[in-house]
Amino acid sequence: MLVIHTIAELRAHLDEHRQNRRKIGLVPTMGFLHQGHMALAQKAREESDVVVLSIFVNPIQFGVNEDLDVYPRDLPHDIALCKENGVDIIFAPSVAEIYPEPIMTSVEVQSLSNILIGRHRPNHFRGVTTIVAKLLNIVEPDKIIFGEKDYQQLIIVRRMIRDLSYKAEVIGVPIVREKDGLACSSRNARLTKEDRAAAVILSQSLKKAQKRILEGEKDVSTIRQLIEDDIKSEARAKIQSIDICHATKLDTLDRIDNQPIVILLAVAFGDVVLIDQQLVTPKEKAL
């Protein structure tokens, strides 16, 4: 496995692979890797001949008073985990390598970036799509792999790739959860012991809502209230947003008919905001 820090060196290696007609899969991450990321790497391994995993804490997707300075980093741990999980190349550039001077160009999927999580994190998704566009230009992958936990991000990246005619196919991978149901996240490491125990309320409330929908509940306000009451029963949880949307368009809904939906949560525990989601389709059975 190679660990590469410069764009020029990465391109040189990937050009050799392309000359040998090898398919390239890209897994973009911000590091501090966990089993959720490894599920993405394993999917990339299945879908491609060469797996590139990028590690870059992207400053332009963090807002004022967000957690850029305290975002967890551990490159030696990440390297060891990638070696165990079939990654061929880690691309771990510095900020100066990616943004050698103040960036003047950005990429934004306008309408989708300013709703849902975007209401609370202005310019966040513009930062995400800008770095993903740069990585697509640098790596030129055949496949790019994202987790479904960051569901709005997945939908936005799909739209950007379609709108800008990138060749890469976007593949989404289902959420990987801890044994108690908490979605794997790098931010989990920043939770206190008490907040970590409390955070399981997210997956629990989503499963209850899923069950209620599959039992026939159609009214979105009823489902939202069910989730809100459940989360508020945990004193350590502070709700940032609860959204119930069309699963592919992200339109907010008043009523659930036969369309696939997604329930999106953003909830703070102390100064750590966790996100989670549940996809529900009409023929799905409750877990």
From Swiss-Prot:
(R)-pantoate binds at Q61, Q153. Pathway: Cofactor biosynthesis; (R)-pantothenate biosynthesis; (R)-pantothenate from (R)-pantoate and beta-alanine: step 1/1. It is an enzyme of class 6 (ligase). Keywords: ATP-binding, Cytoplasm, Ligase, Nucleotide-binding, Pantothenate biosynthesis. It catalyses: (R)-pantoate + beta-alanine + ATP = (R)-pantothenate + AMP + diphosphate + H(+). The active site is at H37. It is found in: Cytoplasm. GO terms for biological process: pantothenate biosynthetic process. ATP binds at residues 30-37, 147-150, 176, 184-187. Its EC number is 6.3.2.1. One of its GO terms (cellular component) is cytosol. One of its GO terms (molecular function) is pantoate-beta-alanine ligase activity. Beta-alanine binds at Q61. The reaction proceeds by a bi uni uni bi ping pong mechanism. Homodimer. Catalyzes the condensation of pantoate with beta-alanine in an ATP-dependent reaction via a pantoyl-adenylate intermediate. PANTHER family: CYTIDYLATE KINASE/PANTOATE-BETA-ALANINE LIGASE, PANTOATE--BETA-ALANINE LIGASE. Belongs to the pantothenate synthetase family. This is Pantothenate synthetase. The lineage of its organism: Bacteria, Pseudomonadati, Pseudomonadota, Alphaproteobacteria, Sphingomonadales. The gene is panC.
